[in-house]
Amino acid sequence: MANLEVTLAGLNFRNPVMLASGILDSTPGILKRMAETGAGALITKSISLQGRPGYPGPTTVEIAPGTWINAMGLPNPGLEEFLEEFPLTSLKVPVIPNLVADTAKEFE
């Protein structure tokens, strides 16, 4: 089998295939399964300091026949609850947080 290991920004990945933020990173069980079935890294859903409810539905709109866009409003439980709910240290692959903030100061 080919060796697909890569190093990026000082992180070692068993392969360059990463699970992007989206539907498949919405529960701890799914993240664990993705790590076990070959993802080189996992990128979390959006995480903010304080929880966000997201936009009320509908969150999709058809902009042309057969062409849809969505905007969820970055719903998330907030950093503390996320860390309690998602046992990231038990995963055997790098986890890249998708951090969002209302101001640059929140990133400090």
Regions found by a protein language model. Name each.
Residues N3-F13, M18, I23, P28-E108:
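Active-site entrance/lid segments in N-terminal catalytic domains of soluble metabolic enzymes
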